[in-house]
């Protein structure tokens, strides 16, 4: 299996720290609002990657945090006349509801920054003791220039970093920092109503970057296999995480850095973001469309590539999903009919080849486009085979299992629960079959209309009548 490593800018053979196990840390949301489609891209992309690792037999330890204290949290809490704690609780609950609807597997652990304050303070103090951090008026900064490879992840040199920092730093920070490229590890409390904790440097709160360094190393160890997040986190967030973590532990922080592409919108394909006011929240969009359609659509583009969010794209995803659903229904119908089985070596060879090609595609840095193309072709092969008078039922059982497993990698699961009126529907189907047998077309049409009024779709096939709910 090959994974594109942002740090080296190339695909590398994936070799986990422990055979058969994968440690993954993915930066989670800052919980001051509902997540938008752009935020969901990262959640969906890394859930798909996690599911594929599990499909390949790996045991995945997946940690994804909640940033429940920072400037955005404080400002939003003031605006809504509530506390940071209550704001966080509300939007963590909303996040879990939205991601459950999108069939995202819960992380092994969802740590929260505010629950790790002691560990954060200890981490910062360790960096001060090592001489790579310093305190000024209750704020603590990291000496970025002390870290030899600072800028490597985002492919920037010190001169570029200095120029960028000089443009964004305010006068107060400039007077405190030894160097414009230094960044905050701990922020002093500015106002009485601001959330804060006691520390050796006075009341304050953690900086954003230190939170993830502490939570990832606490729960996954000093070195982890994979650290993921959106491309916008490469700098400064992930760059700073590397500097902090490696300065503290003296060990390589992450073996494979993975970053997902943006969601864009409109003809100009602008990045979806709250700052541009061009975003759609998952909470709102799920009132209008099937969560499974959104999930499949967002999974259909290789994780590093941008995806342009559009209604046409969603409709196309819905059409493809219906095709897979119908294929699985037709498979069930043929597996349950009374016709004898007929061995088909051609179909068996097709299944073996399709599985090998699917794995080859996904092993190549999770190339979902190629993998989905193989899935689509397999569905075509199966639908053609299902038209035959006699089918290879053992091969079809294998095909059904394969297709279901592949769809589950993309978070798709077609589970039709038996309704209370299924027995009634079966009786009406039997009555209609009898009417057709007796060539009583008027009664047959009447029963079809009655079934349609109940939301039942009927298919008349050479193997008998099939039905499903619309």
From Swiss-Prot:
Motif ('HIGH' region): 29-39
Catalytic reactions on record: tRNA(Cys) + L-cysteine + ATP = L-cysteinyl-tRNA(Cys) + AMP + diphosphate
Enzyme class at the top of the EC tree: ligase
Any GO MF annotation of the entry: cysteine-tRNA ligase activity
SMART domains xrefs: DALR_2 (SM00840)
Location of the protein in the cell: Cytoplasm
Protein name from the UniProt record: Cysteine--tRNA ligase
Species this chain originates from: Lactobacillus johnsonii (strain CNCM I-12250 / La1 / NCC 533)
Originating gene: cysS
């Amino acid at each position: 299996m090959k994974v594109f490593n942002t740090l080296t800018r190339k695909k590398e053979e994936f070799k986990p720290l422990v055979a058969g196990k994968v440690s993954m840390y993915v930066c989670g949301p800052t919980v001051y609002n509902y997540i938008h489609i752009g935020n969901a891209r990262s959640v969906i992309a890394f859930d798909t990657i996690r599911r594929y690792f599990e499909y390949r037999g790996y045991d995945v330890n997946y940690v994804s945090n909640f940033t429940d204290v920072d400037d955005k949290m404080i400002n939003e809490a003031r605006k809504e006349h509530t506390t940071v704690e209550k704001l966080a609780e509300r939007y963590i609950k909303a996040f879990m509801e939205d991601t459950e609807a999108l069939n995202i597997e819960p992380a092994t652990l969802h740590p929260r920054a505010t629950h790790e304050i002691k560990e954060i303070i200890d981490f910062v103090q360790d960096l001060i003791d090592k001489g790579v951090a310093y305190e000024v008026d209750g704020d603590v900064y990291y000496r970025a220039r002390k870290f030899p490879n600072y800028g490597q992840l985002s492919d920037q040199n010190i001169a570029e970093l200095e120029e960028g920092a000089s443009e964004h730093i305010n006068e107060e920070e400039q007077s405190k920092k030894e160097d414009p490229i230094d960044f905050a590890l701990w922020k002093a409390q500015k106002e009485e109503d601001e959330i804060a904790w006691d520390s050796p440097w006075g009341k304050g709160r953690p900086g954003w970057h230190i939170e993830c360094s502490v939570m990832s190393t606490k729960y996954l160890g000093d070195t982890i296999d994979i650290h993921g997040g959106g491309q916008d986190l490469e700098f400064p967030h992930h760059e700073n995480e590397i500097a902090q973590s490696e300065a503290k532990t003296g060990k390589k922080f992450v073996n494979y850095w993975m970053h997902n592409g943006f969601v864009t919108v409109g003809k100009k394909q602008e990045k979806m973001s709250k700052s541009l006011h061009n975003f759609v929240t998952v909470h709102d969009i799920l009132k209008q469309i099937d969560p499974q359609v959104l999930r499949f659509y967002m999974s259909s583009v290789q994780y590093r590539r941008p995806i342009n969010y559009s209604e046409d794209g969603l409709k196309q995803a819905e059409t493809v999903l219906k095709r897979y659903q119908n294929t699985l229904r037709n498979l069930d119908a043929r597996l349950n009919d009374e016709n004898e089985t007929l061995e088909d070596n051609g179909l068996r060879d097709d299944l073996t080849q399709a599985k090998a090609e699917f794995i080859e595609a996904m092993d190549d840095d999770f190339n979902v486009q190629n993998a989905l193309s193989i899935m689509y072709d397999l569905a075509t092969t199966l639908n053609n085979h299902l038209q035959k008078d006699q089918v290879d039922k053992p091969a079809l059982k294998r095909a059904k299992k394969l297709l279901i497993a592949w769809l589950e990698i993309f978070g798709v699961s077609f589970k039709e629960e038996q309704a209370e009126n299924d027995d009634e529907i079966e009786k009406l189907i039997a009555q209609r079959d009898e009417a057709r047998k007796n060539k009583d077309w008027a009664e047959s049409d009447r029963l079809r209309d009655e079934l349609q009024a109940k939301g039942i779709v009927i298919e008349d096939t050479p193997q008998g009548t099939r039905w499903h709910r619309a």
